[in-house]
Each structure stands twice: as C-alpha cells, then as structure tokens.
Design a protein with these regions (language model features):
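A structural micro-motif
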Residues: 9, 55, 82-83, 110-112, ...
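Short catalytic-loop micro-motif centered on adjacent basic/acidic residues
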Residues: 33-36, 59-62, 114
C-alpha cells in the first residue's frame, strides 16, 4: 500500500495481485472516497483498512466497467453502503455522471471534475480532484496534448496522475 499526504487528507493506493486494478482511497478526517473497486481480494485490503481505521466509505467512483475495476465493488459496498458513481453509459452506478460534471463530496472538501474519454471502453472517464491536483485515469493514459487541453479548458494542472494499473506519476517538473 502506498500512502501520500495531500493538501486535504491523504491518498492510499491498494494494488492487488493478479488481474486487479489499483483501488485508490482518498481520506479526509474519518470519511473516505474510493476510485475503482478492483477485484475482491484487493477490495478486501481496502475493507480491512477502513475497519482498522474506523473510516466511513461514502462514494466509489468508477473509471470504467471492465471486470478488474468493478468486481470488488460489492465487497466495498457491504460495510457502509457507499454511493457508486459511474458514467451515464455504464450499467453500474446509482449516481450517473457525464462529461464536465463536478461532484463535490465530504462537505465540499473534495471536488471531482468528470472528464469523458470514451477511449478504452465506452463508459471510460477520468476524475480530476481539483483541491489536491490529482488525476485518476483508469486505463487510458493522457497524452501531453490532452493534458494541455485539460489545463486550457478547465484550469486543471495535475501534479499526480493515478493509473488503473502500475505506479503513480508525479508531474511537478513536467511542462505541458
């Protein structure tokens, strides 16, 4: 598990073994938001962490509906009944979002801009959390042109890019 301290709260990355996507947990005080659900064995790591630290999971944001990103969602939902956020083209989710929607959670301490990519999977989105300058990209890696467009169109300049698989990228020195 990787843990980073952020401007508002902390960010944890749970990496599962064999076929699982990363599951990210943003924690502010005793409340949490997950990005993707991973496979059940990765979700178990998240649930154990939530239980040990007495955290309430309020939302699960899905980047897309491939099995390795969603199979752990039911395990995550058992404990605190979080709301599941997904693109309108997804069959999953009870909060439907579209391109350029903004979802504010945990008393507005976290603010997620939804960016529809449509690449990789028809319901694929990125989530840009503006208070911490974090971009969750699922399985679609942005090009430098897309990062430039993101900055020009939305004033967003991510410092951390969090992929569905692999390690985070830190962009403090990248110019785009």
């Amino acid at each position: 598990m990787l843990k980073l301290d952020l401007k508002r709260g902390s960010l944890l990355c749970f990496s599962g073994r064999f076929l699982s996507s990363n599951v990210y947990l943003m924690v502010v005080e005793n409340r949490a938001v997950a990005v993707d659900g991973g496979m059940p064995w990765t979700a178990n790591l998240v649930v154990d962490y939530l239980n040990k630290n007495r955290l309430k999971l309020e939302y699960i944001f899905l980047t897309h509906s491939h099995f390795d990103h969603v199979m752990g969602v039911n395990r995550l939902k058992k404990r605190t009944k979080p709301r599941v956020v997904a693109h309108t083209r997804s069959k999953r989710g009870d909060v439907k979002v579209k391109d350029e929607d903004v979802i504010r959670v945990i008393d507005n301490k976290l603010s997620f801009l939804v960016l529809y990519t449509g690449f990789h999977k028809v319901d694929h989105v990125w989530y840009y959390e503006s208070n911490n300058q974090v971009l969750f990209i699922g399985d679609y890696l942005p090009t430098s042109t897309e990062l430039k467009t993101l900055r020009e169109r939305h004033g967003a300049k991510p410092k951390i890019i969090l992929p569905g698989h692999g390690k985070p990228a830190f962009l403090q020195t990248l110019s785009y």
